[in-house]
């Protein structure tokens, strides 16, 4: 199980919890550990650290992260928050303050599509539905005037032209699940 902490001073960290509950710090210098996903076919791990305005990728081999590099930076269009991946290996990134979800080609760093929403703070997204072709999008009402954005805090469901993949389940002791 992988998780991170938050720190306004970029003093947070990113951890792995094994099946027995033992935590190992993988890296530090984290502001707000967000959007995590794996491309298991290519041994890649994607990571959003919201205040850095970027999505990074690591090589992921034998449970170890290495070779961190930046996929893209989102200056001026919102901060990357939650994230998921579709079956084509493209990333769908929620942009906090950006009124949208973007579909990102992680190999070129290009935004190849987007879904506009009527709320600023788009928090996360995940594929679901019978064939995983529906994108469920969470939003937040935190720091929002609900008179201006009455749908803030809502969950949206959008039919896409692609399919996502099932989520990974933690295989450890059920007390940690």
Annotated model-derived regions:
Residues 1-5, 10-13, 23-45, 74-91, ...:
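Beta-rich, blade/repeat-based domains predominating
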Residues 6-12, 50-53, 96-97, 146-151:
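Short, solvent-exposed loop/turn segments at conserved positions within beta-propeller repeat blades
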Residues 12-15, 54-56, 100-102, 154-156:
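A short loop-to-beta-strand structural motif that recurs across blades of beta-propeller domains
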Residues 16-19, 102-113, 126-129, 135, ...:
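Flexible "stalk/tail and boundary" regions
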Residues 17-21, 59-64, 105-109, 159-161:
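Short loop/turn segments that connect beta-strands within beta-propeller blades
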Residues 21-28, 67-73, 110-115:
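A short beta-strand motif characteristic of beta-propeller blades
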Residues 37-69:
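Glycine- and Gly-Pro-enriched alpha-helical subdomains that act as flexible
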Residues 126-177:
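Blade-level signature of beta-propeller repeat domains, shared across WD40, Kelch, NHL, RCC1
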